[in-house]
UniProtKB/Swiss-Prot annotation:
SUPFAM superfamilies from the UniProt entry: Winged helix' DNA-binding domain
Coiled coil start-end: none
Keyword flag Cell membrane: no
Descriptive protein name: Transcriptional regulator SlyA
Residues of the DNA-binding region: 49-72
Domain HTH marR-type as annotated: residue spans: 2-135
Complexes and interactors: Homodimer.
Length: 143
């Protein structure tokens, strides 16, 4: 029987995010919005749209619509990069701070619930295996 590990991991991410979605509904954020804000907050300040798209794992054109919506909500600003006028840098606004705190809180509490009953050693082993899988995939992509 062939391994369904890739499908299993993809399904895990889907159900994990699906659990978080209703918990963030009061903030009026779609999954795309909160995933984008979460990643902007985790990356070094003023990342480019290209870097953010890579971090999230989506194509840049798909990201642009989400960034337009977040900018309309007053949660981010974008400005042209001084070195490359084609590139745009993304910055969180002060208005986004309380929302980011709530998003982080929901994500952290949900993570604790999901990982309940799993030892820190087991989590470390799983994280190590995921890192190895990612490295293998990256090596295969560069061949």
């Amino acid at each position: 029987m062939e391994s369904t590990l890739g499908s299993d991991l993809a399904r895990l991410v889907r159900v994990w995010r699906a659990l978080i979605d209703p918990r963030l509904k009061p903030l009026e954020l779609t999954q795309t919005h909160w995933v984008t804000l979460y990643n902007i907050n985790r990356l070094p300040p003023e990342q480019s749209q290209i870097q953010l798209a890579k971090a999230i794992g989506i194509e840049q054109p798909s990201l642009v619509r989400t960034l337009d919506q977040l900018e309309e909500k007053g949660l981010i600003t974008r400005h042209t990069c001084a070195n490359d006028r084609r590139a745009k840098r993304i910055k969180l606004t002060e208005q986004s701070s309380p929302i980011i705190e709530q998003v982080d809180g929901v994500i952290c509490s949900t993570r604790k619930e999901i990982l309940g009953g799993i030892s820190s050693d087991e989590i470390a082993v799983l994280s190590g295996l995921i890192d190895k899988l990612e490295k293998n995939i990256i090596q295969l992509q560069t061949k």
